[in-house]
């Protein structure tokens, strides 16, 4: 029985580590069939960090979120102005944002909350967020639905 418990525990730990490693990666796909995967650490190292403190409608308290501006990500991976961006979550939920939002509201792909990595349990590893305190008129269901969490892929529609 001890051996069986040990084997089950070993398999669980192995799966949890693999799952955790995969969860900390973000796939960026272009409509012209090119894609790349970037880790949380690479996002932190390759892009300027953008932070803001805001109150999200589903949280009791304001929190400080840090991440990369979506516009910085698209500037690297899609230098021509993209048409639309789609965000996919681990549970296959999808949301889209218009390119105008990138300039006007500067949403971020957040990877930390109050200085800590966002776990899957806390809606991570990546979340698309708007600064609702800076732009209170965005605190409406239409924009709440765009603030997707547990992001695992960003699809950039740019190719003709």
Question: What are these regions, as identified by a protein language model?
Answer:
Residues 3, 18-20:
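N-terminal cationic leader/targeting segments used for protein routing and processing
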Residues 22-160:
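N-terminal intrinsically disordered, low-complexity segments enriched in P/E/S/T
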């Amino acid at each position: 029985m001890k051996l069986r418990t040990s084997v089950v525990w070993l398999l669980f730990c192995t799966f949890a580590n693999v799952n955790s490693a995969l969860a900390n990666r973000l796939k960026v796909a272009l409509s012209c069939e090119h894609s790349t995967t970037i880790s949380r650490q690479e996002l932190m190292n390759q892009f300027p960090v953008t932070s803001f403190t805001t109150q999200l409608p589903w949280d009791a308290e304001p929190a400080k979120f840090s991440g990369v501006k979506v516009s910085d990500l698209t500037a690297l991976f899609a230098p021509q102005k993209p048409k639309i961006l789609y965000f996919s979550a681990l549970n296959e939920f999808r949301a889209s944002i218009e390119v105008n939002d990138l300039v006007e509201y500067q949403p971020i792909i957040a990877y930390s909350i109050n200085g800590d990595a966002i776990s899957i349990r806390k809606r991570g590893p990546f979340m698309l967020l708007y600064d609702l305190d800076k732009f209170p008129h965005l605190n409406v269901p239409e924009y709440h639905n765009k603030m997707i969490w547990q992001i695992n892929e960003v699809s950039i529609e740019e190719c003709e």
